[in-house]
Amino acid sequence: SDGERETIEVPGRYDVKPGDTMVITTVLPDDFNANVMAIRASLQTVRFYVDGSLRAEYDTKDTRPFGKDSASRYVFCNMSEDDAGKELRIELTSHASNYSGVVNTVYCGDKSDIWTNIFHNSSRETIIAFFIFFAAVVSVMFSIALSIVYKTHFDMEYVGWCMLLGAIWMLGESKLRQMLVPNASVLAAMCFVVILISPIAVSIYIDSIQGGRYTRVYTCIEALAAVNLIVCTSLQLFGVCDYIEILPAGQGMLAVCCVVVITTFIIDIIKHRALGYRPEMVAMIVALVLALIEAASVYFVVTMSGFFIGTGLIVILFVNIIVTIKRISEIEYKRQKEESDRLRNQTERVSLQMMKTLAATIEAKDDYMRGHSYRVAEYSALIA
């Protein structure tokens, strides 16, 4: 919007101030015959002009609940062979410094073919996200059921809640999210909320597997994360800052949580207390490393797949399934042993009572006969 012109390549990233409009112009070839053009808006308002006439527009100012930018999604513009030789102008506007000046791939062709290509390239992460989502729901419900049956708590419930947050984040970052929900802005906002809540979920889970040794430390982390969530959400709701602008605050809190978790792991390893939860510790370290890679990638790539976080969550899931099965086996073994001991003690008490009754009967007969018989002596020896 400052009037500067330059030749660009698509896709690409260019120096545009947040809030300024980047205008891309080109002349459609004479043999143009596509019926649709499409581009992915990355937190951008998009307008298509053909021969100076507005053909398509994507702007969520009237539908988004809060924020200054439109949620990322694919924007389609209907075209025809009659547009051949006409000027095409695409306007991109974003208030986010990470996305102003971003130009994604422009697609031409049939709408179904474009969606097929998008689905082919992006379906893997979405399928993983749905798998994690349903696995999380099953994990939480199964853990609650086990807790009721065995009258004890299972850490897998906390894993389920962490997985649920991760699945929501992955679905929110999915390139197919506009096919999943009618209002992509709400789902996009949930991605940032998940990052703000994550330190709380991670702290609760780690504190549980560590047996509450560092409850005070994790309580402080949870309190700080809750305050951070309230402050950031308030800034978003009152239009002071968008989530994307204060994202470093949430990522910083998550990084602090990770540092605390790693520190407690090191302390437990030094003091030989980590053996009790070694599988969970290894899985958590792998997941934390992958989550930090995913969180940091927002500053280097335009779109995130969620593949790293999904992989980390699946690792934690399978490790906790194994740990839970082992714990159930131990509980069952202990229960069966207690039941066996109870039955043995009960049998011994019944046998002792029978012998006492028999002895009393023999003694009564002895008193009646006023003498000891060989059989009385024999029974007495057995009882003794």
Where are these regions (language model features)?
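Interfacial "cap-and-anchor" motif at the non-cytosolic start of specific transmembrane alpha-helices
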Residues: 167-342
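Acidic/His-rich, divalent-metal-binding segments that scaffold phosphate/diphosphate chemistry
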Residues: 333-384
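First transmembrane helix
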Residues: 110, 116-150, 248-270, 310
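Accessory carbohydrate-binding/adhesion or oligomerization-edge regions at the termini
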Residues: 1-13, 91-120
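Beta-strand-rich ligand-recognition modules
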Residues: 46, 50-87, 92-104
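Juxtamembrane interface at the cytosolic side of transmembrane helices
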Residues: 138-168
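Aromatic-lined ligand-binding clefts that engage carbohydrates, nucleic acids, or primary amines
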Residues: 27-50, 88-90
